[in-house]
Amino acid sequence: MNIPSDNIPGRMGLNLTESTPAIKQWAYPWNAPGQAIESPLPTYEELHRRDRENAALACAQDLLQKQSVIVRMSVNAKVNKLEKEQGVKRANAYLAKTFLERILPRVNIVSERYHIGKMTADTVRLMYRFNHLPDMSKEDIELLAQDISTFITMELSSINDEMPEAGELKVLHSLYVRAARITQAFRQSAPDFEKLMRRYFDEPQAAAALSRMMSDQWWARRLRRHAAEWREHLHIALNHVCKKVSTYASKQMIRDWKEQKRRTREFLKSMELEDEDGNRISLIDKYWGSVANPAIRRTEMMVRIRGFENVCNELGYVGEFYTITAPSKYHATTIHGHRNRKWDGSSPADTQNYLRTVWGRIRAKLHRNDLRVFGIRVAEPHHDGTPHWHMLLFMRPEEVEQVRGILRDYMGFWFGIG
């Protein structure tokens, strides 16, 4: 029996073709797939992750509060900027991860070079103030210098009572040793220490050195310099000295330098020179007309180099221009302005000492090979303040390849020939 297709059960009223999409039907509405029910409570994994993040954030905040004002202001400024632009979560991540893993180790390396780690009972208050030198004003540094000089004077006064029958030389030696130990405890080198203690103890020289260590003005100069180096080194560690922020030196150092130059100009303007006949001339005019003027000093240097080159060419020498720089570990910042992970905490002064040491070895090698070179050398900073040297050396034409080979051997690929 032939049954029309329209009368087949399940096909009534349907004209199925290959192009008709399949329609899913469910016996009951609750059989249809729905959205999964999510628990309103966090999972154990989320709770543990949140606890770890909160603990890391609290640890970072606690460590940040122990840092100097320079570090706190820099990190807080970055955190506030991230919170404003990308939200609280991104700002907390920067504080808990970037600060702890990248910034804080660099800051600790720098601080260990300048602060006093082990304190004694009699100088604990002075040393505590000393460890806050980067945050101290000029007046606070001068007050600390007075207190240290007073402490040294009081310490030395007890030596005379302890050695009533000793000779003058022995007493002077004991006074110098005690003062030198206190000076070294405050991260300063005692005057003429190597010469007096390891070569010959000269009484007049020791008395002069002892007088300096008891002077508050001497201590003020030393502490101001120590504080300035400490602050600038912290700025370098915080990546404040680079092409993206401030080239060659930090903004604070540049402001201080300009202020010092301004005070010097004001002092020179207020002074006059007078000869025996009563003729007077402004001291500032003589200053700007001498080599103290940077423009005149630079012009004189260029003229001297050109004249030096002309004389050497007439004598048959040839000139070679060399540029030597330090390895990557001496650079706090990469060429693109990012933090250098290979940096070992070296300061620009450390880099300069490294270049001097290597150049001393090169000179010794040249001397052993009977190669006589002479010329002019200048130091120039990279964008992160790390110095490199430019040297214009003159030598005999037949000695050029030997000199180049020696520089290659000692400098490796850390040098260039122009």
Predicted segment positions?
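Positively charged, glycine-rich low-complexity segments
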Residues: 1-386, 394-418
